[in-house]
Amino acid sequence: KELPFDGEIMLHEELAKKREDKEKLDKVRRTALDTDPLYVLFTSGSTGMPKGVVGHHRGVIDYIDQLSAVLDFDEESVFGNQAPLYFDACMKDIYPTLKFGATTWLIPHELFLFPVRLVEYLNVHKINTICWVVSALTMISAFGTFKEVVPEYLRTVAFGSEVFPIRQFNLWKRTLPQVRFTN
């Protein structure tokens, strides 16, 4: 079913040319609540009915505060983003960057097909923190990438979403004994 739209369409290119309206911005800042929506994540509809799940400011703030404390994120963190920006897993890279003034590199997705080039990219950009799905990590170790190139700057590897095969996990741990691995 198509819903009618009666809002105003705004283009970034046009908005960027306008001067900021200090009064409007001040009003938003005065009236904003931590329960105000921040984003809507639309599901695929695997239950038969697609739906949007609303994430609010307080939920993201609390999540990032706790994640940052556990994984020791700070202004020196250099994230290598693997998750698409339309997927909520990207919050682990994007929001700590905003919180601390850290750095996030949006890794081109095609590099995940070429493990040696992917690790070279990590080294060129001095990426020290990755929060990736296990399949991305396993692809690097399973193809013998560490025989050619090793991530030089990693200090934190956070992973989840699937079981990390113990053989591959141990290969990562042996190759990078100084790195903190967190599931």
Q: What residues fall within each predicted segment?
A:
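Carrier-protein-dependent adenylate-forming modules in NRPS/ANL systems
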Residues: K1-G59, L71-D72, G101
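Alpha-helix capping/helix-boundary segments
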Residues: E2, S135-L137, F164
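Conserved ATP-binding loop and adjacent catalytic segment of the adenylate-forming AMP-binding
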Residues: D21-K27, L106-L113, I130-C131, P177-N183
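Short hydrophobic/charged patches on amphipathic alpha-helices used for structural packing
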Residues: R29, V116-V119, F146
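Conserved S/T- and glycine-rich ATP-binding loop of Class I adenylate-forming
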Residues: P37, T43-S46, F79, L85, ...
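Short hydrophobic "strand-cap" motifs at the C-terminus of beta-strands
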Residues: V40, Q82-A83, I107, W132-V134, ...
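Conserved AMP-binding/adenylation subdomain of ANL enzymes
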Residues: K51-G80, D88-N128
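Gly/Ser/Thr-rich phosphate-binding loop
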Residues: K99-A102, I127-C131, S141-N183
